[in-house]
UniProtKB/Swiss-Prot annotation:
Residues 195-205, 327-341, 585-594, 1333-1354, 1395-1419, 1584-1601 have a biased composition (Low complexity). Pfam families: GLTSCR1. Keywords: Cytoplasm, Developmental protein, Nucleus. The keyword tRNA-binding does not apply. InterPro entries: Cu_amine_oxidase_N-reg, GSCR1_dom. Residues 81-93, 179-191, 349-371, 379-425 have a biased composition (Polar residues). It comes from Caenorhabditis elegans. The lineage of its organism: Eukaryota, Metazoa, Ecdysozoa, Nematoda, Chromadorea. This is Abnormal cell migration protein 38. One of its GO terms (cellular component) is cytoplasm. The keyword Cytoplasm applies.
Length: 1607
């Protein structure tokens, strides 16, 4: 009988393709429409005794309730027609309640594929119906009915197959279902009866999923063979599927044996009528309708009685609609009865089956033949779908774990679940397959299926594995697979569904073509074809799939049903092992349990059983199963091992008799065996690696493991991983750089093209091309005329046009252009003119032949053009470095673009210029003027930075070799960017520039261009200020050119603009934005690791540009020679400081020492206005030695005095801001030019109450001082330096000690560096209140009274940030200080670094206690010139009058310590209520400008941040603010590089000129130079480290002092 291919074959490819590995489904891709899925007689022994013979009569199968789904599938299958069909192996396992429900539910959407999972209703006569299905609920629909194979009953039945084998009555049902028209001798009688039935049963499979567990369908009511019946059923199912398009509702109805027999008879009669009607003999429409009505009535009655009332009702309602046959009801009914409950009795003849029965009137029985055979296969398929078959496949393959024969319900449910997702398409496919399956096994339970496989297949298909054999294997495999899948997948059901689908699909995919081709070609005429079809299928399977696949498929049989079976074996996880099926009840239940947990041992055991079963079944189905059995058996190596031990140790006595040597020999033998085994395994793995399976998807976890395990031979090297990041970053950076370069080039080209005002060269090119074309044509015509005149006349266009009067020769002659005058002068002969023209031809259309290239330098022509604009030497440099040549100005190099810059008038030379290759920073069409500017800028750069070679040198070109003017310019420009440089400090810097400039670090190549930019920009901004010989005009180009790079590098507002494509920018942006510190400087301070801009500026230059108006009202720093600076007026507000109040030094943010006072010889008076709040009870022992009003505010180390000497914020701000605004260069000078520094040691000897100058050089000679920060406040990231012990080693314990916790907060306040020292003195010692923190103070530190908090505004190097109290008291200030000036950075370590020592110690330093003050005074060298005591004009209400600062001792270096304003807040607990702040008001110059300056001097936040409970010493806050510009050192010291300029490394420190240098830049790490600095500053740093012996006064200094002075 010919099937309608479109009905069930067409869908296979569309939706049923499984993505599973080909082996997964036994190489059969079970698809509802796939003929490969058609169960064949050889699918496998339904029972040990019966072969599933399509030729057999339906009577043999009659006993089995055919649960034919409306699509011809078994009821269970109908219920889940699509899923079961698609998931061949899975549907077997899916007998659990969920799977049934799913199947039934999915049947609506997914047509039942009879072949996918023939609904084998396990008539568990031997076992409770629920057990086989695993249905625990007796009320469930399947409680009394055997689940349909579609729901995985088949798999359960595989376990139950053994039982089913005995239950021949059920087998006849299976046979009845499976007889695909092949009337076997056994079934012939029944076939006569059943073929009509089966043909009607195909309808019945749709409606009759009800299969009484009793094998009552054995009575074949029609002579039709099983094959015919199946064919009819399939045709009907196909019709229904086609009509319903997956709308068929497959309903399983429990039918009593009597009803089943009745239905079988009705179906057989219906089939007969349909056949007759098809043949056209008679029209039995009424009879067919009556039969269908009866069948529907039976099903309806049973459905009404069944637990699934809704499905039954839906079926009843849908029976009338053949298309919608209550598939939903059946599916729901099945879902209600999970496959697990072994209710194989569940006889659900879907209403679709009834409708089919009715439709079968239309459907000719002839279709039944092929379906019948197919039906036979579906029973086999049912077995195959069962986990056992899947397991067989896997077991044979050795994939016992892969047996997807999950619990019957589980696998089927999984299948159905998987395929419910694509229900519509699959349902159609499944419906078609289901038809076949319905014919084959739709009514069969797994038992029935197994039994039929064993019995039915036994006779026709001896090769097929006996159902019994398959049962144990399937049962075991199912359990194993289920267990494995349960672990492997979400559940055995799901696993089965997924895996089996994949496996089945793949297996079927490989096998499908064969079976499909066979069916399509031979049309699979019926049971007679079944054996051949099956054999062909098996053969094809063998050919297309490996033995494992074949074995899996052979487990049931490689018929379409077998294909399904194969799918299930692939689904072994979800499928039921045959062995389990042999134990239907226990298997269904156990499989469910196993599905949840995989039992490897059980699986292997099952595998062996499966092998045995497979072998037995193979005897019938064929060698394939046999091979599978072998493979399955092999996995059970344990058995052999067990045998070996027995042979080795047959008797314990023998074991006892074995001597040690013998035992050793045995062990050695075993070891060798094991070694060999391992070697073989490894070799096998290596062989697998040679031929990896990389195409098919993984079937399951075991497949993943097996496939991937061999790869362990490949070692995973760490190296590629370790350096990947860096390599990738490097490569990507390079790629990005190249891409940007190319993009810039393109942009420049486009820009030039856009900017071109003339298209002359393009026109010339076009004209030339046109002329050249005409010329060549003319030459060709001439040649032709000379050679072959006739041809020429015949073919010439000219002649033709002339003849046609289209060309007027005379007129053309007249229009010929005359020879140019310059050519007329030449007496050219005929051939000479063209040759002369050739000289002007374009080469390759390159009108600009001498095109500039980054790789090849301009030809002499272009050079000559550029030479007038750029010096040849620059050119050489430029050409020496092609990249510089690309940019008009190379910011890094600082040379103007030397490549010829075509002016707009030079059209041809435009392309010649290297602009094609220039980068973004180039400006394309530079006019000659611009080029001149660039040239001048280049010269300027050369003066400042030296030639490119010099810039390339590791050390920057020494400033000594730079013109003074250049230095001044750069300093002036850079100064605004140095917030902490005061005018005075700039002056000092100028004085010390000589020493500074030679240090290579002073000019860092990276910063040099920027510095130049800054200087130039600053000069442009403040031209009067810069006495530089270089004109601002020159500097401007330099600035502009370098600015682009600066902007890229720093991102400062002046530099931010991108100048790449445009001519050099004006200096306006720089003028507009004059930051106290260049943004790049700030960034550098943030990043300690960033290269330092080391610009050494001659003091003279700074002084020239400095406006030293140091009055309180001075907002701007007047340009004055630092030596002539006005005395700093420091306004000290001595106020009682509450313990909680941090010294309001924030306001007096210690900006970079604004003025580095010149050498001590000319101490400048520091006018400090001390406003002492009368509340201060503790007398401030601030002895101001007013030897000379030194501008440099003394670094006041307040002894426990609550008096807080802070310069009035307004004044300090004014001063700072004015200085910063007016001359940042001055600031830098001041910073750099502290000739005499006071060491941060306790400069004040309490006894003497005078500051003792300490030669700074001793302290810092030849090394960078490493200050340790006890606790870095979060706000000073850039100031954080690892704390070091006295030896300079990093201190492990960063937390300050309880007793000596000097928290130094270095904050930028109003542009000044404010250092707040919050010292937690030794709680045990009262002295702490009187201890002077050895905060670097100007030459005289005033030991304030115990409660005196002195805030000294020193325009000098800010106090070391390391001494900043790390506590958040100064948190805001810290934030402000995030703007990190290098100067500030250096200052944080050494407040004296940049403070001009010329400033006399301000009188603000009062020795609170004679002991401390003397110690401090003696040990703290006064950086200020001794003649410059700062008079503290502080109302000392309750404070001890500040002691006059002792003149620095002659032996000390008279370097005015460039101590930034240091606000020392020493709040003693006693003085908390009446703490007077002595704020030194430094005019806030930077505060307004510096974004980082956050708080005012007395910011309550700071105070609150300070430990409120601390004694005044604990609250000792030293805010070092740059000294007033007024403090001018009498003799300019070689300016120390402003701290900002030299962050860590100051080459100047190492420079020989540094003898009188102020404290060099403090570095994190110890210098290679001697540890003198550390030893000197050890106390200062130790307290920060918490390792200091501060509690015990060091060198006579009270333990509370922040710095103890070493003698």
């Amino acid at each position: 009988m010919s099937y309608e291919e479109d009905d069930w074959f067409s869908y296979r490819t569309e939706f049923n393709k499984r993505a599973d590995s080909p082996r997964a489904a036994g190489n059969y891709d079970f698809e509802s429409g796939n003929i490969d899925n058609i169960p064949l007689n050889d699918d496998g022994p339904l029972s040990p005794s019966q072969d599933f013979d399509l030729a057999g009569t339906l009577e043999e199968y009659e006993s089995y309730d055919l649960r034919l789904s409306p699509n011809g599938g078994l009821n269970r299958e109908d219920q889940q027609p699509g899923p079961s069909g698609n998931n061949d192996g899975q549907y077997h396992v899916m007998q659990n309640n969920d799977s049934f429900a799913q199947h039934m539910q999915s049947s609506n959407t997914i047509e039942y594929n009879s072949f996918e999972m023939p609904t084998v209703i396990n008539s568990n006569h031997d076992v409770g119906p629920y057990q086989d299905l695993g249905i625990d609920d007796p009320n469930s629909f399947y409680a009394n009915q055997q689940p349909s194979t579609s729901q995985g009953n088949d798999m359960i039945i595989n376990e139950n197959y053994e039982m089913m084998g005995p239950s021949t009555s059920y087998m006849p049902q299976i046979d009845h279902m499976n007889p695909s028209g092949n009337s076997s001798s056994q079934i012939n009688h029944q076939q006569g009866m059943i073929v009509p039935q089966v043909q009607q049963q195909p309808a019945k499979p749709k409606t009759t999923k009800k299969r009484p567990p009793p094998k009552k369908k054995t009575a074949a009511q029609a002579p039709d063979t099983v094959g015919t019946v199946l064919t009819k059923v399939n045709k009907l199912t196909q019709q229904i599927d086609n009509n319903n398009d997956n709308q068929e509702q497959k309903i399983e109805t429990r039918i009593s044996a009597e009803d089943l027999v009745r239905v079988s008879a009705l179906l057989s009669r219906l089939d007969v009528y349909q056949k007759e009607q098809a043949q056209g003999n008679n029209t039995h429409d009424q009879d067919i309708e009556a039969l269908q009505a009866e069948i529907a009535q039976v099903f309806t009655k049973n459905m009404a009685m069944s637990a699934n009332d809704a499905p039954g009702n839906s079926i009843l309602s849908q029976i009338q609609n053949l298309t919608s046959i209550g598939s939903s009801a059946s599916s729901s009914a099945q879902p209600s009865q999970p496959a697990k409950k072994a209710a194989p009795k569940r006889k659900t003849v879907p209403n679709t089956a009834k409708n089919l029965a009715q439709n079968q009137q239309i459907m000719p029985p002839q279709a039944q033949i092929t379906p019948t055979k197919l039906v036979m296969d579906p029973p086999t398929t049912t077995m195959v779908p069962s986990s056992s078959q899947s397991n067989h496949m896997y077991s044979n393959d050795g994939f016992t774990t892969y047996n997807q024969m999950d619990e019957p319900g589980t696998s089927q449910q999984q299948q159905y679940n998987d395929y419910r997702q694509p229900p519509s398409q699959e349902s159609m496919q499944y419906g078609h397959q289901q038809i076949i399956q319905a014919r084959v096994v739709p009514s069969m339970n797994q038992k029935t299926h197994n039994y039929r496989q064993a019995v039915v297949f036994a006779s026709p298909n001896t090769n097929g594995p006996s159902s019994q054999l398959q049962r144990p294997q399937s049962g075991m495999d199912q359990m194993q697979d289920q267990q494995y899948h349960a672990q492997d997948l979400q559940g055995s059901q799901v696993q089965q569904t997924f895996v089996s689908v994949q496996h089945d699909g793949q297996i079927y995919q490989e096998v499908e073509p064969t079976l499909r081709d066979f069916v399509r070609q031979g049309r699979y005429q019926g049971p007679q074809d079944a054996p051949h079809l099956r054999q062909q299928l098996i053969t094809n399977v063998n050919a297309t799939t490996n033995k494992q696949m074949v074995h899996r498929s052979q487990d049931p049989t490689p018929s379409p049903g077998n294909l399904q079976q194969f799918g299930e074996p692939l689904q072994r996880h979800g499928s039921y092992p045959h062995s389990h099926d042999m134990r239907p009840n226990s298997h269904s239940q156990s499989q469910h349990s196993y599905s949840n947990h995989y039992d490897g041992a059980t699986e292997f055991f099952d595998v062996s059983m499966q092998h045995q079963d497979s072998q037995m079944s193979q005897i019938q189905p064929g060698s394939q199963h046999y091979v599978q059995q072998q493979e399955l058996y092999h996995p059970i190596g344990d058995q052999q091992q067990m045998v070996e031990p027995e042979s080795e140790y047959p008797v314990p006595q023998v074991t006892n008799e074995l001597s040690e040597e013998e035992l050793r020999a045995i062990m050695e033998e075993k070891r060798q065996i094991r070694q060999k085994r391992l070697k073989d395994i490894m070799i096998d793995q290596l062989n697998r690696l040679e031929e990896p399976v990389d195409v098919t998807p993984f079937r399951n976890k075991m497949d993943v493991l097996e496939r991937l395990l061999p790869y362990h031979h490949f070692a995973n090297e760490e190296e590629p991983v370790s350096d990947f990041d860096s390599t990738f970053q490097r490569v990507m950076d390079n790629a990005v750089h190249q891409a940007n370069s190319i993009g810039n080039r393109i942009r420049n080209i486009v820009l030039r093209d856009t900017m071109r005002s003339s298209t002359e060269w393009e026109e010339n090119m076009i004209l030339f091309l046109e002329t050249e074309s005409e010329r060549r044509k003319l030459e060709d015509d001439k040649k032709l005329a000379d050679q072959d005149l006739s041809t020429f006349l015949r073919n010439s266009d000219i002649i033709q046009n002339v003849r046609a009067r289209r060309l007027d020769v005379e007129r053309t002659r007249l229009r010929v252009p005359r020879i140019p005058a310059h050519l007329k002068e030449l007496d050219l002969q005929n051939g000479q003119l063209s040759s002369l023209y050739r000289e002007y031809e374009f080469d390759s259309y390159d009108e600009n032949r001498p095109r500039g290239s980054p790789f090849v330098y301009e030809e002499p022509e272009s050079e000559s053009e550029s030479e007038p604009e750029a010096e040849p030497e620059p050119k050489k440099d430029n050409f020496a470095e092609p990249e510089p040549a690309r940019g008009d100005i190379s910011p890094l190099i600082g040379f103007p673009q030397l490549s010829p810059i075509p002016s707009p008038s030079r059209y041809r030379n435009e392309s010649e210029s290297t602009f094609d290759w220039k980068d973004e920073d180039e400006s394309p069409l530079l006019s000659p003027e611009t080029e001149k500017i660039n040239k001048a800028a280049d010269q300027f750069r050369k003066e400042i930075f030296g030639t490119q070679e010099d810039l390339d040198k590791s050390e920057p070109f020494p400033f000594e070799q730079i013109s003074e003017a250049a230095r001044n310019q750069h300093l002036i420009t850079a100064q605004p960017q140095l917030p902490r440089v005061d005018a005075s400090s700039i002056g000092s810097l100028a004085s010390s520039s000589s020493t500074v400039d030679h240090s290579p670090q002073s000019i860092h190549p990276v910063f040099s261009p920027k510095a130049a930019i800054q200087s130039s920009s600053v000069q442009v901004m403040k031209p009067p200020r810069s006495p530089s010989s270089v004109s601002c005009k020159l500097s401007t180009p330099c600035v502009e050119q370098s600015l682009p790079e600066e902007s890229h590098y720093e991102g400062s507002p002046e530099i931010d603009e991108d100048y790449d494509m445009s001519p050099i920018r004006e200096n306006e942006p720089a003028e507009l934005i004059s930051l106290p510190i260049s943004v790049n400087m700030i960034k550098k301070e943030k990043e300690d690791s960033t290269p330092k801009l080391k610009l050494r500026i001659p003091a003279a230059v700074l002084q020239n540009g400095i406006v030293a108006s140091e009055d309180e009202s001075d907002v701007a720093v007047e340009e004055t020679i630092p030596a002539i600076r006005k005395p700093l007026k420091l306004r000290f507000n001595l106020k009682d400081i509450k313990l909680e109040e941090p010294s309001p030094d924030r306001d007096v943010a210690s900006s970079r020492p604004k003025s580095r006072t010149e050498p001590p010889p000319t101490p400048e008076k520091l006018h400090v206005k001390i406003k002492a709040s009368p509340a201060e009870t503790t007398p401030t022992k601030l002895q101001l030695k007013e030897k000379s009003p030194a501008k440099t505010p003394v670094f006041k180390t307040p002894l426990q005095t609550p008096i807080k000497m802070t310069p009035s914020p307004s004044e300090s701000r004014k001063r700072r801001s004015a200085k910063i605004e007016d001359s940042p260069a001055q600031k830098k000078k001041l910073l750099n030019s502290g000739s005499s520094f006071v060491t941060p040691k306790n400069g004040l000897r309490a006894e003497l109450d005078e500051t003792v100058e300490r030669p700074l050089r001793i302290m810092t000679d030849g090394r960078k001082i490493v200050m340790k920060i006890s606790k870095v406040s979060r706000n000073i990231n850039h100031f954080v330096t690892p704390r070091r012990d006295k030896k300079g080693n990093l201190h492990k314990d960063l937390s300050p000690t309880n007793y000596t916790r000097l928290t130094m907060k270095l904050m930028k306040k109003k542009g000044e560096l404010s250092v707040e020292f919050t010292e937690t003195p030794n709680k045990n010692s009262e002295e702490d209140d009187h201890k002077i923190p050895n905060i670097p103070s100007t030459s005289t530190s005033i030991p304030p009274a115990s409660t005196v908090v002195s805030s000294v505004s020193v325009k000098g190097r800010p106090a070391p940030a390391s001494r900043k109290s790390s506590i958040d008291t100064a948190g805001k200030d810290k934030k402000g200080q995030l703007a990190k000036n290098k100067a500030a950075f250096c200052n944080r370590f050494n407040p004296f670094a940049n403070v001009p020592s010329s400033k006399p110690s301000t009188s603000s330093a009062v020795s609170a206690t004679p002991s401390t003050s003397s110690a401090v005074s003696a040990k703290l060298p006064t950086g200020k010139t001794p003649g410059r005591p700062v008079a503290l004009s502080t109302p000392r209400s309750s404070h001890k009058p500040p002691q006059a600062v002792v003149a620095p001792r002659p032996n000390l270096i008279r370097t005015a310590p460039v101590v930034p304003k240091i606000t020392v807040t020493n709040a003693s607990e006693s003085s908390l209520p009446s703490k007077s702040h002595i704020p030194i008001e430094v005019k806030p110059k930077l505060s307004s400008l510096l974004p980082w300056v956050s708080d005012t001097d007395e910011s309550p936040e700071q105070k609150h941040k300070l430990k409120k409970t601390m004694p005044s010493i604990n609250l000792l806050k030293v805010k070092t603010e740059p000294p007033e510009a007024d403090a001018v050192t009498s003799k300019p010291e070689s300016p120390r590089a402003s701290s900002s300029m030299s962050f860590f490394e100051d080459a100047f420190l190492r420079s020989p000129k540094r003898s009188n240098e102020p404290l060099p830049v403090v570095e994190f790490s110890d210098d290679e130079e001697n540890d003198l600095a550390h030893s000197t500053f050890s106390h200062a740093t130790d307290h920060l480290l918490g390792t200091s012996n501060m509690n015990s006064s060091t060198n006579g200094s009270s333990s509370g002092l922040p710095w103890s002075t070493d003698p």
